[in-house]
Amino acid sequence: MSSITLALSKGRIFEETLPLLAAAGITPTDNPESSRKLIIGTNRPEVRLVIVRATDTPTYVQYGAADLGIAGKDVLIEHGGAGLYQPLDLNIARCRLCVAVRKGFDYAAATRPGGRIRVATKYINSAKAHFAGKGMHVDLIKLYGSMELAPLVGLADAIVDLVSTGSTLRANNLEEVEDIAPISSRLIVNQASLKLKRELIQPVLDAFAGAIKP
């Protein structure tokens, strides 16, 4: 019997995906937050979940190790989206990609045309495109976490990072100075899988589409 595999990451995306899965009649048999299993069955024998790092979701789907996945727009921009069909913005895990600096830093002066600043981020492609559009020279420093520390210790003038409430920025004496893009999670589908397994995948797409909240 044909089957489909859905790639998900732990945490907020998984929790906010549960109502969408329920709308498609899919119930996981384990909770990845409490289980060490990386492959999780469901109440439907033809559907299984694989638990991956958020940044790896597009790669699993691109190469067909998973037929579908749910990934943030930020991750998809960095990945490039090659080989992926992106039919739905699920409107979950919403936040924004923004530029933040130390309070008191003159960002307007630093970002005049011809200016040059140093920016720490894990979103290299997004940051590069944003500052290139402003006609700026920018030195990008790749970090994987604790972005807020970089301006405080002189590693960078600014950071590009995801922001939800802004409380972490405020706690570290930083402030948002520019929005780059609104971010939410998207359903992604392997293009070959959509052709070969449409009878299994299309009902999931339809159920998800009907359950998306504005």
UniProtKB/Swiss-Prot annotation:
A Pfam family recorded for this sequence: HisG
Alphabetically ordered keywords of this record: Amino-acid biosynthesis, ATP-binding, Cytoplasm, Glycosyltransferase, Histidine biosynthesis, Nucleotide-binding, Transferase
Keyword Cytoplasm applies: yes
A single GO BP: L-histidine biosynthetic process
InterPro entries found in the cross-reference section: ATP_PRibTrfase_cat, ATP_PRibTrfase_CS, ATP_PRibTrfase_HisG, ATP_PRibTrfase_HisG_short
Catalytic activity as recorded in UniProt: 1-(5-phospho-beta-D-ribosyl)-ATP + diphosphate = 5-phospho-alpha-D-ribose 1-diphosphate + ATP
Annotated metabolic or biological route of this protein: Amino-acid biosynthesis; L-histidine biosynthesis; L-histidine from 5-phospho-alpha-D-ribose 1-diphosphate: step 1/9
Compartments (UniProt record): Cytoplasm
Enzyme class per UniProt: transferase
The keyword Cytoplasm appears for this protein: yes
Role description: Catalyzes the condensation of ATP and 5-phosphoribose 1-diphosphate to form N'-(5'-phosphoribosyl)-ATP (PR-ATP). Has a crucial role in the pathway because the rate of histidine biosynthesis seems to be controlled primarily by regulation of HisG enzymatic activity.
Domain remark from Swiss-Prot or TrEMBL: Lacks the C-terminal regulatory region which is replaced by HisZ.
Name used for this protein in its record: ATP phosphoribosyltransferase
Organism: Azoarcus sp. (strain BH72)
